[in-house]
Amino acid sequence: KAELHTFISKESNPSFSLGFVPTMGALHAGHLSLVSAALAENSLVVVSIFVNPTQFDNPNDLSSYPRKLTEDVQLLETLSKPHILVYAPTVEDVYGSQPTADHFDFGGLEFQMEGKFRAGHFDGVGTIVKRLFEIVQPKNAYFGEKDFQQLQIVKKMVEITQLPVHI
């Protein structure tokens, strides 16, 4: 985290704009599209690669989630490497010794659609996005629209916490 802040502060100037694309890795064309959009609008883009344990209700799903950090970094290098910073924290970096999710009142949105079948999933999503926003401190953050419910959850979390991040 300290290295991330040191690097970003060296790059910072009055016209500096930091974009952020949070991912769980296993990057694909959709992720690259988000990173490209972020590169077009920001001085520097941080791409996080973090498999978040608090959004999995099934430990088998967590353990079987693909982790391809080397391949993901190579894929990002096909874009504009000098303007992309990969942040791949450990669970301890983000949560300390005990990964737990915060509870958010998403106004019932968390119980609709996918939320009906994945208890606590969106508290985990809200928690990790909030923590990553606090660590990275971006001006702009980019999320795919494919997962409409998750996008709405993130927007609601930003509204609740009043974090100064444009989605």
Tell where the protein language model's regions lie, with residue ranges.
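Nucleotidyltransferase catalytic core that binds NTPs
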Residues: 1-167
